């Protein structure tokens, strides 16, 4: 480009105009946040859930929309805004306010708790019984003070039988 001032560009973009092609391409391919009204409302609702006082039946939120409408991006933005906080470096304890878990392709409790353990960075032994996995996941969730559990692709519950769906919903 021959004009170094680029008055038609936003100030934060002007510096990229003369950057090498690889850098400009990388910037173009990066994720972008577009804060439309419903996305901002979803973020506000999740913030409200995060600060909700503990009680027996905690409220929940379900983000619903067609594919490629940005549901996962909303969750990712929220998660990035609430990153892990070191609590006690000497003991290695951390606080994980928001934990995002990918729902397994079917409503399988063992796979779900394996996904929770993986998201927490905990070891998971495939041969462990469901009760062992569940106990370990619950202990680590409490120890890391997880305030909000986000389950992405929760509609995968529907791929199971009615009995599997009910059992999994009861688990949640």
Regions found by a protein language model. Name each.
Residues 1-59:
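A short, basic N-terminal segment
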Residues 4-20, 43, 108-115, 123-171:
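Mid-core helix/loop region of P-loop NTP-binding domains shared across ATPases and GTPases
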Residues 52-56, 90-95, 140-144:
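Conserved catalytic network of the ASCE P-loop NTPase/AAA+ motor domain
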Residues 55-77:
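Walker A/P-loop nucleotide-binding motif
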Residues 57-59, 105, 124:
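Phosphate-binding site recognition
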Residues 58-62, 98, 148:
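Residue-level preference for the first positions of well-ordered beta-strands
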Residues 80-91, 122-124:
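Post-Walker A helix-loop "phosphate-sensing" segment adjacent to the P-loop in P-loop NTPases
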Residues 96-107:
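A short hydrophobic beta-strand->loop->alpha-helix junction that borders the nucleotide-binding pocket
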């Amino acid at each position: 480009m021959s004009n170094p001032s680029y008055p038609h560009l936003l100030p934060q973009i002007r510096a990229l105009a003369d950057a090498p092609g690889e850098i400009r391409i990388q910037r173009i391919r990066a994720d972008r946040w577009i804060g439309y009204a419903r996305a901002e409302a979803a973020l506000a609702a999740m913030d409200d859930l995060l600060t909700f006082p503990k009680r027996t039946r905690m409220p929940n939120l379900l983000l619903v929309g067609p594919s490629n409408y940005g549901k996962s991006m909303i969750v990712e933005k929220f998660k990035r805004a609430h990153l892990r906080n070191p609590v006690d470096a000497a003991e290695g304890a951390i606080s994980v306010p928001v934990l995002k878990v990918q729902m397994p392709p079917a409503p399988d409790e063992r796979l779900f708790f394996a996904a929770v353990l993986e998201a927490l960075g905990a070891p998971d032994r495939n041969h462990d019984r469901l009760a062992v996995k569940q106990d370990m996941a619950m202990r680590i969730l409490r120890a890391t003070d997880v305030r909000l559990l986000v389950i992405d692709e929760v509609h995968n519950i529907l791929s199971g039988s009615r009995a599997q769906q009910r059992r999994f919903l009861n688990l949640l």
